[in-house]
UniProtKB/Swiss-Prot annotation:
Species lineage: Eukaryota, Viridiplantae, Streptophyta, Mesostigmatophyceae, Mesostigmatales
GO molecular function, one term: structural constituent of ribosome
Protein name: Small ribosomal subunit protein uS15c
Name of the coding gene: rps15
SUPFAM superfamilies found in the cross-reference section: S15/NS1 RNA-binding domain
Domain of life where this protein originates: Eukaryota
Amino acid sequence: MLKKKIIKTHANHTNDTGSTQVQVSLLSSRVAQLTKHLNNHKNDYSSQRGLKKLLGQRKRLLKYLFVKDPLGYNNLIIQLGIRPGKSLVN
């Protein structure tokens, strides 16, 4: 249900489920869930590893989006409240 809502808000067209914006939004949602989980379970190292993998994937997608569509990148990081990457800031 949450996934469909995220897809609907960030999709470019009605059947868009795989665009970069949608993928980053879904990863950001999962990152928020894992962060909340890790606040309660500090020693859950497998979840910490999973969180790091998700953050790396999101970082790669954001870098791709910055190269292909800088305006879309800026809009997305503002909507999601993500800080711009260090290597992407002039």
